[in-house]
Amino acid sequence: MISDSLNKILNRNNIPLDEVEKVVYEYILQSIFEDIVAYLLEDNNKENIMNNLRQFEDKEIVVNKLILDITGMKVNESELSTITKWVIAFIEKKSSRIKIKDKEKIKLLENQNYKCKLCKREIDLCNSEYDHIISWKLVGDELENNYQMLCKHCNRCKSSSILYRFIMLFKKY
């Protein structure tokens, strides 16, 4: 259920509610993850959690406790699975980037119909940049399907901000 005023502004501007809901949902999950990362970067927390993850076969138990303790949020199985993958990627992150080949960039461009994932402008190999959906500084190159092609403008504005996608949602309609 959304407020009448929000519904009216979305309708006036032809902004689909399902798009807003999707972006807000992804923002919430990424915010939970960023809170966990901030916690892991304090003191010896990362080392302690790494030890807990090694001890338990079901890593989701450890991550679920982290989520509850740090954010107070309750997540479903799918959300827990996603956040657990992100936490493990953060812990296993390597300090150097993997260089992506043009062939892989072209495949991403084809999957995106040669449009920037955020602003939907037409792009090609020359005027686009390879981007990590979940910031490289958080998960490195450890996650599959964490890549997208953006126009240079969106990639530079986005940086590691998870809010940029939300902002662009309103600018494209």
Where are these regions (language model features)?
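Histidine-centered nuclease catalytic patch
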Residues: 120-149, 162-164
